Swiss-Prot record:
Listed GO CC annotations: cytoplasm
Stated name of the protein: Probable Xaa-Pro aminopeptidase P
PANTHER family: XAA-PRO AMINOPEPTIDASE 1 (PTHR43763:SF6)
Family: Belongs to the peptidase M24B family.
Amino acid sequence: MPVDTSQRLAKLRELMKERHVDVYLIPSEDSHQSEYIAPCDARRAFISGFTGSAGCAIVSMSKAALSTDGRYFNQAAKQLDENWLLLKRGMENVPTWQEWTAEQAEGGKVVGVDPSLITAAEARKLSDTIKDTGGSLVGVPDNLVDLVWGGDRPARPREKVMVHPIEFAGQSFEEKITDLRKELTKKKRAGMVISMLDEIAWLYNLRGADIPFNPVFFAYAIVTHSTAELFVDEAKLTQAVKEHLGDKVALRPYESIFESLKLLSQAAASNGDEGHQKFLLSDKASWSLNLALGGEEKVEEVRSPIADAKAVKNAVELEGTRACHIRDGAALTEYFAWLENELINKKTVLNEVNASDKLAQIRSKHKDFVGLSFDTISSTGPNAAIIHYRAERGNCPNIDPNAVYLCDSGAQYLDGTTDTTRTLHFGKPTEMEKKAYTLVLKGLISIDTAVFPKGTTGYAIDAFARQHLWRNGLDYLHGTGHGVGSYLNVHEGPMGIGTRVQYAETPITAGNVLSDEPGYYEDGNFGIRIENIVVAKEVKTPHKFGDKPWIGFEHVTMTPLCQNLMDTSLLTAEEKKWVNDYHTEVWEKTKGFFNNDELTRNWLKRETQPI
């Protein structure tokens, strides 16, 4: 049932009127532009009732709209009440949220937004769009949704920060800072201000627990040619963390970042070298940070060099990625064997949450397990068509053994982050379900076996995954692959496989870890997605045109595919060989976990038989 947002919107409009704001924007992100956020920052969800991870809410004095992408069309339609208009991003004749905002601002109206929740680039672009219709954009320092939320708003987390040991990180934080300073020297810049939480955690080899599923902590950082600072609530730091940082990193209160930026900007202004007066700031940093540093005169907005460095995993991180995916594959195999036995042999009634709870319990037994990497998508039948479905405890259906079951799940281990999707059917699938599954599988294999010259982007290879669906007039409304962190965020940039502008600008590089996850969804009927994690690496080719290195992929996910859903007549001989080789690898790498578990071992052996 949708949440009744009438009173919340009425209170928000009262506050807008007091501050002379005609239209108010509520983005999804927090002040660090995080995709996944802490409960205290779920402002868009609070005001609209829509709980998906992506979207922007726009509220005028008489209307309210929610814009989101294809992953969430179904979910948003179910969760929004009658006060809201759903803007389906990317669909024909549907305005973007910026265009819709500009329409509401016609005739000199004022659009307000918390400047900490959008980037400077977004603010500039939006301001230009609004000006075209006669409106204007202003930053509103006090977040109006927070004022509506009042005392019911959850407290900001204060979880402890932990050291991420060199045995898992593979590189000391001192070396990472040295590399960043080389970048500053190369660009002739005074320093870099860092606000992305995963970048700070990676840079200083620290991890936290402030945001569910993401081992990060609220902080800012500043690195100059001679100093390194960490702005964090010091009560969260253990003695081990303080000893780890030693005298190489100065600790500052989290709240003091804006005052420090003003002082830093003033100090840089006295530097005689004009180039060294500017600071690097990620193009994902907030408008408020940009303004505090002095705006365009003092800031060079760049794609973060830390994001680029973090995305190329070192040898230790790659070995950890391989190892944790074997353990995680064993956990998923045990879960699927258990689930089939319960549903088919024991006739147990299990709902979607009962099942995902069991999976979490199985995972927790494995070495170096810390927690889940996102909320498990455990979906039966029509719910599998909701791309980012979330089963509600106490209000979700029982798993139907005669329908498709889609499970998208992952875990955080000290040595890596996992993300795997498998679609299964424990009964007799329809011909369309088998066809869809097999076309999706062909797409997964096409990415897995792709070879391309260095410098190729994920945008360029996205069609490899879709080609088999396209030939049948089918498609899916999400990207094909995203970067994956190393005991960090399960969604990581800057590279990925899809049609995002960012993916068109970022070549896939040896050492990148990405998902390979094509899908197909029929609303109200079923959904198919298969996801493996792959590591980009240099590969040998018979020839070397242009004397360039060539890039291919190594899959690290070790979980059986669903033979019951395959229409093998649609697979080529090469594709059948790939499936058989993959299943042989899964069997060899995971069978040792089940020497004392006959049920799972037998299931694994059956599921990895040649096709």
